[in-house]
Amino acid sequence: MRKVLGVLMLISAITVEAQVNGEDRLGSWHMYFGTNRISNKFSIHSEAQLRYYEQAKNFNQLLLRAGLNYHIDANAWTTFGYGYIVTDGSFEEFPEETNSIEHRIFERFFLKNKVWEFNFEHRYTLEQRFLDFRDRTDVQHRMRYRLQMTVPLTNTFFLNFYDEIFINLQEDIFGQNRLYAALGINVTENLNLQLGYLKNHFSEAHYDRLQVAVTYNPDLRGVLKKKK
């Protein structure tokens, strides 16, 4: 009987914790990504994301990112950029609650390769994170690796999968892991839409998120040449 009560108490505690931190809610991420080619070697990366604990409500995070890409060749490029992130770290709303602010410097290296009809992309990231929690500040460093696979179904439709691991370069080495699957639509040569599902794992919490992403990659080289 004691064992049964113990199990029931454990289940109850887990359920309450999931309700408090929002693990039991299906959240949503609304995202825009852009790469504007300005020369044979350089392009500009732009990005905006709105993340919610629930479906388009209960704000979690605003992420704005921009960077300069240097294209080594068609299958390799680097990025140096800056990110501005506003985060509400609590699922519940509290009186006089303040959001944290992060200024992030990041460096990335991309490699692409193809195996049969499968298109692979390897993304390596280093981040220098300057965090302001209002009552204290902190500087943290992080490393990320993402393996992405894109599978064309037709000229219009494709599947996209990735797994990304976050490694902290200080205490608590494991940061998080993201596992993603999506159906994509090529609207034009430079514009695509994706509707996906993300499993976001932390050491003490696991979240499920729907993702809606718009990617627009216009080539501005012709426009810039005309202006000259």
Which positions does each model-derived feature cover?
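Transmembrane beta-strands of outer-membrane beta-barrel pores
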Residues: 48-54, 82-88, 113-115, 126-130, ...
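Predominantly the C-terminal beta-signal and adjacent terminal strand-loop region
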Residues: 161, 173-228
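Repeated loop/turn-to-beta-strand initiation elements of outer-membrane beta-barrel proteins
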Residues: 41-46, 75-80, 116-120, 155-159, ...
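Outer-membrane beta-barrel domain signature
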Residues: 19-23, 52-57, 92-100, 132-137, ...
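Bacterial Sec-dependent N-terminal signal peptides
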Residues: 1-22
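Residues on the lipid-exposed face of transmembrane beta-strands in outer-membrane beta-barrel proteins
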Residues: 32-36, 66-70, 107-111, 145-151, ...
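Residues that define the transmembrane beta-barrel architecture of outer-membrane proteins
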Residues: 26-28, 60-62, 101-105, 139-143, ...
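Start-of-domain marker
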Residues: 19-79
